[in-house]
A protein has these predicted regions:
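Helix-loop element at the rim of GNAT/NAT acetyltransferase active sites that forms part
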Residues: 26, 31-45
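Conserved GNAT acetyl-CoA-binding A-motif
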Residues: 115, 122-134, 144
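Acetyl-CoA-dependent GNAT
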Residues: 46-93, 98, 102, 176-178
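A short beta-loop-alpha structural element at the N-terminal edge
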Residues: 15-28
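Glycine-rich phosphate/pyrophosphate-binding loop shared by adenosine-nucleotide-utilizing enzymes
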Residues: 14-16, 74-80, 168
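Conserved acetyl-CoA pyrophosphate-binding loop and the N-cap/start of the following alpha-helix
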Residues: 105, 109-117
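Conserved catalytic-core motifs of GNAT/GCN5-like acyltransferases
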Residues: 131-134, 146, 151-168
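C-terminal "cap" of GNAT-fold acetyltransferases
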Residues: 158-197
Length: 197
């Protein structure tokens, strides 16, 4: 993946840098996840407070499989977003998108800006459909994806388990990349997100 760095202005005028993740980001990424409130971490797929998990991610970093970007302010990571590519078979036109933003920077357009960057990469990779999976109790995440045009396609009963061992239904949401691109442009205009360079 070609290296890039973009500085954007959020809705409140805060300048934030968006760039691809690097192997050296392990400690900063771990600090980011450990600083998240437990409610925000409860529904993540792995124990992101575990140093070994983050180290494994950094060792296995491969942008042909997972496009991973971060948002940074004052050298601290404040957002993490990934696009998981299927690559082969009947799913090769699909990818899964995930995004986590520090609570302090939620509702300011940062999540939308991160997802827009990943959608741009999806277009480059000729991805036609994006999916997002979450637990049924993650209502705010569902609303966030609905705002950018994702639709709930399925709900699988007691399909996933949170980090406390409790079962939840898994919600699968889907969107066409072409429709999503237009929606992202509209949302960035709404949030008044400006790319500086």
């Amino acid at each position: 993946m070609e290296k890039f760095t973009k500085t954007i202005l959020l809705r409140d005028g805060t300048g934030v840098c968006i760039r691809p993740i690097e192997k050296e980001d392990g400690p900063a990424l771990l600090s980011f996840f450990r600083a998240l409130p437990e409610d925000d971490r409860l529904f993540l797929k792995e124990d992101v407070t575990n140093k070994d998990v983050i180290n494994r991610w950094m060792e296995e970093l491969n942008f042909d499989k997972v496009i991973a970007i971060v948002a940074e302010k004052d050298s601290a990571i404040i957002g993490d977003a990934t696009l998981h590519l299927s690559q082969r078979g009947w799913h090769k036109h699909m990818a899964e998108i995930r995004c986590v933003v520090s609570r302090e920077f939620q509702q300011k357009g940062l999540g939308t800006a991160l997802m827009r960057e990943l959608v741009a990469h999806a277009v480059e990779k000729r991805i036609l459909k994006l999916s997002a999976t979450m637990m049924d109790t993650q209502k705010s995440a569902q609303r966030a994806f609905e705002r950018i045009g994702f639709k709930k396609e399925a709900e699988l009963k007691d399909f996933v388990m949170d980090i406390n061992g409790k079962y939840h239904n898994m919600v699968i949401m889907v969107n066409d990349v072409s429709e999503l691109w237009k929606k992202m442009e509209d949302l960035l205009h709404y949030y008044d997100i400006r790319t500086m360079h």
